[in-house]
Amino acid sequence: MLNYISVICLAKLERRRNSDDEIDVEIDLGAGMPKYPLELNDNILWVGTMNEDETTKSLSDKVLDRGNLLSFPRPKEFISRAKANSVEAASMLPKNVWQSWLDANVIEEEQFISRIDKYKKGLEAVNEAMEFAGRALGHRVWQSIENYMANHPKVIAAIQAESFDAGVCDLAMQEAFEEALVHKVMPKLRGIETDGETKTQCIDKIESVLFGPNGKDGLAPGLQADFEHAKKNAYETFIWSSAKYLEIEE
C-alpha cells in the first residue's frame, strides 16, 4: 500500500513539472466529509520515510529511482536501552543552509568533468551487459548517479579544497559512485540468474566493469564483497542484501 501511495504521489509531482494545468491530490478528512483537493504548487514537496527490510515488500523501480535512500550495515554489537527517552524535535532548517547545499554542487567544475566520463562509460558497459538478461538502465538512472556524485560531501570537499589533491578526489568520487550504484543499479539486477549463459554474458561482464578483469583496476572495488554475497544464495539468483561497503568506509 505504501508503495502504491508513493507511486501515485510521484506521478502527480511529475505531471506538475511538465504541465501548466492545476494538479491536486485529494486529502481524506474522514467523518464522511468530502475529500479536500490540495493543489500541488511549487512550494509543496512530498516528504516521507519508510523502512525496506524483511518486514516489507520490495519497493518498485519507480520509487527507488526517484527516492533518496539510506543504507545501514548490520550492527556488530547490540546496545541496550533501559528506558525509552523522548527525542527533542530538530530545529527547522534555515533557507540559507539549504541554498548553500544547492550552491555547493560541483557538476560544472573542471576537476569533476574531467573525471566523470569514465564512470559514464562504465555504466554504459553495465547497461549493455544487462540487455542479455532483459534489463536496462534509462537516462534518469545515469543523471541521478551523476548528480549524486556532484553533491556528495566528500567530492565537494575534495574539489573545493584550498590545496587540491588528485588522489583524494579520485577516492571520493569512487566512493560516491559505489554508493549510487547500490541505490540505483543493484536493485535492477535482483532476480537475474547467477548460472549458465546469464552468468557469463551478464553478471560476469558487469563484474569485470566494476572490479576489473582480474579483480583489479575496476570502477567500484569497494562493492566486491557485497557483489559476491549477492551471487551466492540458495535461489541461484542475484539478491543484493548486504552493506559491507559501508564497513570498509568506517
Predicted regions mapped to residue ranges:
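C-terminal regulatory/interaction module of P-loop NTP-utilizing enzymes
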Residues: M1-E250
